[in-house]
Amino acid sequence: FFQAEDGIRDVAVTGVQTCALPIFCLTDFMRTVADILGAKLPDTAAEDSVSLLPALLGQAQNSPIREAVVHHSINGSFAIRQGDWKLELCRDSGGWSAPKPGAPAAADLPPIQLYNLASDIGETRNVQAEHPEVVARLTKLLEKYVADGRSTPGAPQQNAVEVKLVKGPVRGAKAANKKAKGN
């Protein structure tokens, strides 16, 4: 896993029809497969999963299937994507791609990165300084997800461990550096 833009940018082919899939992640396969099998999952299972089955069947969606997607890298770094915005709470890739965690090339990079994927799919222009309101909004949403122990509707869940959203010191982003503990 790495923090580079992680969504799927293609269409699904279902028979002779095509459908644009919503942004999804690996966790969504749990609820999707459960829906395909007609299985009911308990509220305490697959807390971050949503079913893609309606989209795969070509059913019209009146609203996004999820509010945002949370990414968690191999080294524990977080990112959150909502619409065209992606907020990365790390100064490196968070995983195997360059710059790798701890690499000298990452030392001088900002600890918070914000990208507008509509205009910068390659994530080459960090716009966090120009959009502090987006940084604050996405940070607050991520903090809510951590506090709730889930990113989908349902009863709050306990986190297995204390969650620190940002690893290491952050200059000028107190909200993003807060520790959030599950209920």
Which stretches of residues belong to each language-model region?
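Long, internal low-complexity/basic segments
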Residues: 29, 82, 92-95, 102-113, ...
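Short alpha-helical scaffold segments that flank and stabilize functional sites
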Residues: 7, 35-37, 127
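Short coil/turn linker and secondary-structure boundary residues
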Residues: 2-3, 16, 24, 47, ...
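Single conserved hydrophobic/aromatic residue that forms the stacking wall/gate
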Residues: 1-19
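C-terminal cap/loop subdomain of S1 sulfatases and analogous C-terminal strand-loop tails that border
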Residues: 20-113, 117, 167, 171
